[in-house]
Amino acid sequence: MYRMAVEKLLKWRAGKHRKPLIIEGARQVGKTWLMKEFGRLAYSNTVYINFDSNSRMADLFASDLDTDRLIMGLELYVGHKIDPKDTLLIFDEIQEVPRALASLKYFYENAPQYHIVCAGSLLGIALHQGTSFPVGKVDFLKLYPLSFKEFLMATGKEGYAELIDKRDYQMISGFKQTYIESLKHYYFVGGMPEAVQCFVETGDFNEVRAIQRRILVAYEQDFSKHAPNEIVPRIRMLWNSIPSQLAKENKKFIYGLIREGARAKEYESAIMWLSDCGLVHKISRVNTAGIPLRAYEDLRAFKLFVVDVGLLGCMAGLRQRTLLDGNGLFVEFKGALTEQYVCQQLKCHDDIDVYYYTNDRGSCEVDFIVDTGDLIIPVEVKAEVNLKAKSLKTYYERFNPELCVRTSMADYKEDGWIVNLPLYSVDQLSKM
């Protein structure tokens, strides 16, 4: 299985000012596999330490954080010398030993020659709870479920993924049905590595759903195990409300759908907890096209998407029959899967920020507003071959952006003020 994050890791390895690297991401998106695969591809030796199951290593970091002493202890543990130039040190589940997190500062300052990558389940929460490590002493990389392009590669369609990157839309159009069929599979399977691997090996959608259910059960167990007791019920209710939130025509998050009379201040900490552990994407509203969009973010109005389109379908109870119902999967519960899919592909790009737009009267809504740093791109999402874009036209007439994008099942087309980008090519939005 190929992950494009490997390319980012190779750039990190070659960097002149390399710092210890922390890989963030939701549970089961493949952080451990990625670190080990990177070690296999780029180093002669890998030292893997799992702090969740290694009390000896926890004891090593419990006292002195002198880096020479720590390296000596690691060498004694693995039984050989550690070559700093060609050995990858992997610290997994590092949140279990806060002193190990703190040691990254000293490795950066006193022993930068060592190549260290770290990860951990719910690490985002540990970092936001004030675990000691100084800002500026580490690098970060966010890992998400497989993108649609990675899914194509995992399912033996590497050439189709390459064609998307080449942006030869005339040729892409000629293979449209293959892209649509793969996109249907991706909506159902999603990008969680275990689910994708199961699909590749068996093609059994029932087995895929069983894996997704197990992942969702593990997430709910994490709520009880790791969240503060007082907010666990609110996290669970909020999490379970997301499919119904996205099934609305207007997908703005409504607290009243969690329970009658629910208020924002009761659930703010629950949203932050889910966001910190990578389980939800919070997409805030803007009401203008000013640069940077972050300066105009309305934190009170937002949409909430989950980490993976396959998990959303599982949460919503979508059955395998939807795969056989023409292109019905794309429009199930008011196109929620399609908007989730587009959000998920956009969030894979760390160099863009994603928002949505409504005017102050609420009479005009654009599904996503993408800030690339150079451009503000409004994006309207259509689940079928619907080429109407009334709200996008209103936005265009008000702000006159350089580029307006409608993404749908229709072929690529430049039509005056608007570009139609096929849903299966939405990954290319940041390169337009």
PLM feature spans:
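Hydrophobic positions on the alpha1 helix immediately C-terminal to the Walker A/P-loop
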Residues: 34, 38
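Conserved lysine of the Walker
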Residues: 31
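Short glycine-rich substrate-engagement loop in P-loop NTPases that contacts/grips substrate
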Residues: 53-85
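Pre-Walker A adenine-sensing motif
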Residues: 1-15
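Accessory nucleic acid-recognition modules appended to NTPase machines
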Residues: 200-365, 369-371
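Structural recognition of the conserved hydrophobic beta-strand(s) that form the central parallel beta-sheet
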Residues: 90, 115-121, 142
